[in-house]
C-alpha cells in the first residue's frame, strides 16, 4: 500500500487535522487518573453540545465502530417484552432492523424508498394500530444516499403515543445543529470519527438519565451493556469496563477543542453546507446530477447519478485516487450512484480541486 496522504471525501472515517493526528503520538494508561478525568471532561462537553438541559442527560462511551453503539442501545434499552418500530430508507435503518432481529427483539418496520424521507403518515398509522410498540428508532442522516430524515416529527409522534425515542445521529451530530431535549430524544447515538472530526475507535450515546436508569439488567450482551458501562463511568470517575481506545479518546478531545475554535456546531454546519452546495453546482457543470431533491439533502454526503452508458465508478475512483482524492461507491439498490462526502477537514478549495480534476478530463474524458 502506498504511503500517500489522501483527502477522504467520505462520511467517516474522514480527513482529520494534523493536530488531531499528532496527539496520538503519546501513550496513555487506562487506569490513570489524568486519563479518566479527560474521559469525564469529554462526557461533559458532549452533553453540552447535545442540549441546553444538561442536568437531564448523560453520555456513555462504547468501544468499537458506531454500529457497536447502535447495537448497545438496541440490546440494552428494550425490555424482553418490548417492541421496536424502525423507520427505514437506507442501509443503516435496515441495520437496526437486523440488529433487533438477531437479538430476538420484536421489530416492525416503516419502509420508505431510499431517495424519500420517512413517511410520517405511515409511522403514525403503525403507532395507532400497534399498541405493543414500546420504542421507535430513526436514522437522522442516512448516508446510504445523504438524505436527512425528519427526526423532530418522528420523535414528536413517538412521544404523542408514549414511546421511547432512539435516534441514530451517527453522521449528523456535531455537524447539524440539534437539541436532544427540544427534539424529545431519549437515546441519541453517534461516533468519534464523524462530524466531530476525530478518528475511529469508539461511539457514544447521549441518554436521558431517567430512561437509562430503567435499563439495568436488560442487556442481551456483556460487553455491549449500556447501563453497566454508564454505571461504571459514573461511579469510577470515567473508567471504562474493558480496555478503552486511549489514543482515539485523546484525539477526540483535541477534535472537540477544534470544533469549539471553529465556532461550534453552527459554524461547522455552515462550512459543510457551503462545501455541499459548491460541490453540487460544480458537478452539474461537468455533467453529474444529484440523486436527491434539494429539500431532503444533508450537508454531509451527496449521491450523484451515473452520467450515462460507459461510465464506471471504479475508473472514477482509481483516477481520482491517483490525484489524491478518495470518494465512496453508491449503496442503493435500484439506481446507479456514487457518493462524495464533504465533512472532515475539507474546505471549498478542496471541492474546487476535486471537480477541476473531473472537468480537465481526468475521470470521464
Swiss-Prot record:
Where in the sequence is N6-(pyridoxal phosphate)lysine found? 194
Record InterPro entries: Aminotrans_V_dom, NH2EtPonate_pyrv_transaminase, PyrdxlP-dep_Trfase, PyrdxlP-dep_Trfase_major, PyrdxlP-dep_Trfase_small, SP_NH2Trfase/AEP_transaminase
Required co-factor?
Answer: pyridoxal 5'-phosphate
Question: Which UniProt keyword terms apply here?
Answer: Aminotransferase, Pyridoxal phosphate, Pyruvate, Transferase
Keyword Endoplasmic reticulum set for record: no
| EC number(s) per entry | 2.6.1.37
Reaction equation(s) it catalyzes: (2-aminoethyl)phosphonate + pyruvate = phosphonoacetaldehyde + L-alanine
Q: Which residues form a coiled coil?
A: none
Q: Does Transferase appear among the keywords? A: yes
One Gene Ontology MF term: 2-aminoethylphosphonate-pyruvate transaminase activity
Any Pfam family from its record, for instance, is Aminotran_5
Q: What class of enzyme is it?
A: transferase
The alphabetized list of GO BP terms reads: organic phosphonate catabolic process
Quaternary context = Homodimer.
User: Which family does the entry's similarity section mention?
Assistant: Belongs to the class-V pyridoxal-phosphate-dependent aminotransferase family. PhnW subfamily.
Function statement: Involved in phosphonate degradation.
Protein name as it appears in the record: 2-aminoethylphosphonate--pyruvate transaminase
Q: Which organism is it from?
A: Bacillus cytotoxicus (strain DSM 22905 / CIP 110041 / 391-98 / NVH 391-98)
UniProt lists the gene as phnW
Amino acid at each position: 500500500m502506498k504511503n500517500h496522504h489522501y483527502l477522504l471525501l467520505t462520511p467517516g472515517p474522514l480527513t482529520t487535522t494534523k493536530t488531531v493526528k499528532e496527539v496520538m503520538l503519546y501513550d496513555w494508561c487506562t487506569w490513570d487518573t489524568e486519563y479518566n478525568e479527560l474521559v469525564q471532561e469529554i462526557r461533559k462537553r458532549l452533553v453540552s453540545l447535545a442540549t441546553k438541559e444538561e442536568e437531564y442527560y448523560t453520555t456513555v462511551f462504547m468501544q468499537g465502530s458506531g454500529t457497536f453503539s447502535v447495537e448497545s442501545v438496541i440490546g440494552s434499552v428494550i425490555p424482553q417484552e418490548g417492541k421496536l418500530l424502525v423507520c427505514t430508507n437506507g442501509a443503516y435503518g435496515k441495520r437496526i432492523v437486523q440488529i433487533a432481529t438477531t437479538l430476538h427483539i420484536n421489530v416492525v418496520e416503516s419502509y420508505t424508498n431510499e431517495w424519500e424521507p420517512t413517511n410520517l403518515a405511515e409511522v403514525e398509522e403503525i403507532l395507532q394500530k400497534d399498541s405493543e410498540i414500546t420504542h421507535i428508532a430513526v436514522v437522522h442522516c442516512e448516508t446510504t444516499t445523504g438524505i436527512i430524515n425528519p427526526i423532530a416529527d418522528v420523535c414528536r409522534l413517538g412521544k404523542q403515543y408514549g414511546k421511547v425515542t432512539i435516534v441514530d445521529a451517527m453522521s449528523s451530530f456535531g455537524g447539524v445543529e440539534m437539541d436532544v431535549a427540544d427534539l424529545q430524544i431519549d437515546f441519541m447515538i453517534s461516533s468519534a470519527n464523524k462530524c466531530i472530526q476525530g478518528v475511529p475507535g469508539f461511539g457514544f450515546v447521549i441518554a436521558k438519565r431517567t430512561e437509562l436508569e430503567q435499563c439495568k439488567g436488560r442487556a442481551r450482551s456483556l460487553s455491549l451493556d449500556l447501563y453497566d458501562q454508564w454505571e461504571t463511568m459514573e461511579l469510577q470517575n470515567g473508567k471504562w469496563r474493558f480496555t478503552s481506545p486511549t489514543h482515539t479518546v485523546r484525539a477526540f478531545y483535541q477534535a472537540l477543542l477544534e470544533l469549539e475554535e471553529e465556532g461550534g456546531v453552527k459554524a461547522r454546519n455552515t462550512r459543510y453546507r457551503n462545501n455541499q452546495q459548491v460541490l453540487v453546482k460544480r458537478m452539474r457543470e461537468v455533467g453529474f446530477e444529484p440523486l436527491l431533491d434539494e429539500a431532503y439533502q444533508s450537508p454531509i454526503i451527496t449521491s450523484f447519478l451515473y452520467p450515462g452508458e460507459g461510465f464506471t465508478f471504479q475508473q472514477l475512483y482509481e483516477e481520482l485516487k491517483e490525484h489524491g482524492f478518495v470518494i465512496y461507491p453508491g449503496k442503493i439498490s435500484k439506481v446507479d450512484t456514487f457518493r462524495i462526502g464533504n465533512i472532515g477537514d475539507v474546505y471549498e478549495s478542496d471541492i474546487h480541486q476535486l471537480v477541476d480534476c473531473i472537468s480537465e478530463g481526468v475521470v470521464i474524458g
